Amino acid sequence: MRRGDIRTVAGGKDYAGKARPVVILQDDSFDATASVTVCAFTTDGTDAPLFRLAVEPNARNGLRVPCRLMVDKVTTVSKSKVGAHIGRLDDEDVLRINQAVLVFLGLAASPRIKQEA
């Protein structure tokens, strides 16, 4: 299980409660932990570009339909809840989620929102 991998997760809480694809967010350096931090996908087409990142299906990522990564729903689940390997995010999508997580957590300024002086 590596950062950027797309896997299935089922049996988590709230938004990861039903089986759905997730991307592994946690750095590979922390693979000895019993849990893993993930970001779930949804097929809901809500347009919220700062925290719902559109990802189109392709051969590398293994997604079957257009999805959105729910950056506002990052969660940590037990590794025992992580299922099948689906694919892997493209490098460009990994960079997009990196930036989106930083902005959502307030660790970086959004390129789309003007900061007040």
Please tell me what each predicted stretch does.
Residues M1-A117:
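Conserved functional hotspots at enzyme active or ligand-binding sites that engage polyanionic ligands
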